[in-house]
Amino acid sequence: LQVVMNGLGSIAGLRQLALPALGGDLWAQDSLPDLATADIANAGLLKAVRALSFVVRDGVTMAVDYRNIGAEEIGGVYESLLELIPEVTDDATGFELSIAPGNERKTSGSYYTHPDLVQSLLDTALDPVLAEAMKKPDPEKAILSLKVCDPACGSGAFLIAAAHRMAKRLATVRTGDDEPSPDSVRSALRDIVGHCLYGVDMNPLAVELCKVNLWMEAMDKGKPLSFLDHRIMLGNSLLGTAPALMAKGIPDEAFAPLEGDDKAVCSVLRKRNREERDTETMFLVAEGDTPGRPFAVYDTEEFGSAIEQLDAMDDNQMVSIEQKRWRYRAMSGSREYGAARLAADAWCAAFVWRKVKGAPAAVTRDVFRRINEDPQSVPGEIIEEVRRIAEQHSFFHWHIAYPDVFHLPAPGDDPDNELMGWSGGFDVVLGNPPWERIKIQEKEWFATRDPAIAGAPTAAARRRLIEQLRDEDLRLYDMFTQDLRKASGDSHFVRNSGRYPLCGRGDINTYTVFAETMRNLISSRGRVGVVVPSGIATDDTTKVFFQDIMEKRSLVSLYDFENRKGIFPAIDSRIKFSLVTMAGSGSAERKPADFVFFALRAGDLKDPD
């Protein structure tokens, strides 16, 4: 097995066994270093391979057909894995996977999307963009230049569905046939996967499964797996900054007290931040400069050029894939790239900093300026704390992660997106983001850690049991309070960072801020296609957002569904959800929005009655 794995992961393959060089993280020896030198008896390995290769149904043993496994099946596996919690056996010789009470699909807020819903969103969000590309003088180049993103990509169902539709159009352009051959579509699919798709998820398992899913779909005989490290990324799509926000410095609202903070320390920091801003203003006035001068923001143009050069490289040979990997690691590991990320991380960290006596000095306006201009001038403990917080909260800064998509406007020019301060954006943003509140759900949190607390008959009883942990299990109590603080910090950021002026209010649900994020990620001529609860149009907390998309004629369509037919079997049948499509401010089509209500299945959308 090691010979096969090493052969597939090598640059040259293994000619003796007719194994091609596929590359990718699947066979890299450093992907699972703990297992690289582990020993296993042949009998145990055979048992594992047999379990993966065969299933028994009605007493009949059948081989698993991995060649024809689709995105839906892998998505179902992903959703099932989210429910399972590994529990090490008492003798530490193995582990079992079990579903803890209260953990069924709730720990992630994720639900696999029915393919019919995905296809419907592609009709309204992707097809119009593809149609515009087909009208270009060079439609092949135009299609390959499209950028499609899912900011909560999971196992990649939306990206794969989009890739297949784009690949067929690309193959049609290349061959001139309305129904291109499977080989031409497969070749086009590999090009689409390697050049057009972007995805982000905060679950490491999802990121890896998404890559594997894309690789399986786009495998082309004799060619290595596409390089995807710069496309499919790990991070929290909702927690990050943007050039326009950083240019304003640290707002006073950043220093509101969170769970465990000292209110007196918070007041001191808020006052210090305000005084630093006032002192700076007085100095600028004295020097004849403009008060409120924006902070300098790292220009990511150089990084964007590096990514574009990387994408232009041939990827049909394993040597080229390795060169891409080396170049990307060199760029992302460079001092300049690290400084840009550090400044963005520091801005976000100010909102969730530990504000107690004895903690490292907080990132106030002056500290942020010093980090932005010369990180070496800042005490090391502050830099270390910024990095710790950034890792804990999985900060993700879109303009730094994807510098080929977002860029700063030229001096004197206005950005396409004034709120974010950038130009550019994705052509299409798709997805079914999590539907969950940004705060700790005690029942779900304790489901895998202390089932007795999770199973308490009432919320009051549960809180009493939690308080008893102070004396009975201080370690678990500290873990809970730390996660409670993290959730409090995430909510505070969403409400007060300025990134969510429309949805950062009330009892915030992640689907609302995802909808606002997705809208800000598209270019002026881009489109959003998203699955969200129908409360996006009816809830009090989203009325400002919905009013804005109506007034600006951003809404293309809203198709409302009832779940009575179990489209989402894991949620209540009374839940209503919608397929929402929005267009950018420069969209060529500005027709009145299309509405459908009380649909039960995707086929109802085509019913004239």
Give the ranges of each region predicted by the language model.
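Glycine- and acidic
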Residues: 58-66, 97-113, 143-153, 191-200, ...
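Residue-level recognition of alpha-helical structural elements
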Residues: 299, 324, 329-332, 336, ...
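Signature of N6-adenine DNA methyltransferases within the class I
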Residues: 1-32, 116, 160, 167, ...
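Long, amphipathic alpha-helical stalk/connector segments used for oligomerization, subunit docking
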Residues: 269-329
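Preference for the N-terminal adenyl/adenosyl cofactor-binding alpha/beta module
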Residues: 1-167, 200-206, 235-238, 338-450, ...
